[in-house]
């Protein structure tokens, strides 16, 4: 029983090490984590960010509208 438990612990530790290694290689997600949204009076489609008070930086957002508790952010 102790050998089986030790083997499971070794396998679990190895899995954690390899998972952490893969996460370090991926510098950032290649896509936005936002859903499409529409605000009245604004043309086009915005990005709906869930449970955020402001639009995140780095995406070029210039305007927004609130859809409580979310925010719809519009680029340019």
From Swiss-Prot:
Disulfide bonds: 37-72, 39-65, 55-73
GO cellular component: extracellular region; nematocyst
InterPro entries, sorted: BDS_K_chnl_tox, Myo_ane_neurotoxin_sf
Signal peptide: 1-19
Protein's UniProt keywords contain Transmembrane: no
Cross-referenced Pfam families: Defensin_4
Keywords per UniProt: Cleavage on pair of basic residues, Disulfide bond, Hypotensive agent, Ion channel impairing toxin, Nematocyst, Neurotoxin, Potassium channel impairing toxin, Secreted, Signal, Toxin, Voltage-gated potassium channel impairing toxin
SUPFAM superfamilies to which the protein is assigned, alphabetical: Defensin-like
Gene Ontology terms describing biological process: regulation of blood pressure
Motif Cell attachment site location, chain numbering: 45-47
Superkingdom, taxonomy of origin: Eukaryota
Keyword Repeat: no
A molecular function (GO) term: toxin activity
Residue positions assigned to the propeptide: 20-31
Tissue: Moderately expressed in the ectodermal tissue from the distal and proximal tentacles, body wall, and oral disk.
Other known facts: In contrast to BDS-1, may have an alpha-helix which could be located at the C-terminal domain.
Family the entry assigns: Belongs to the sea anemone type 3 (BDS) potassium channel toxin family.
Stated role: Is member of a fraction that shows antiangiogenic activity, since it inhibits human microvascular endothelial cells (HMEC) tubulogenesis. This protein could be a kunitz-type inhibitor with a RGD motif that could block angiogenesis in binding on integrins. Blocks Kv3 voltage-gated potassium channels. Reduces blood pressure.
Protein name from the UniProt record: Kappa-actitoxin-Avd4e
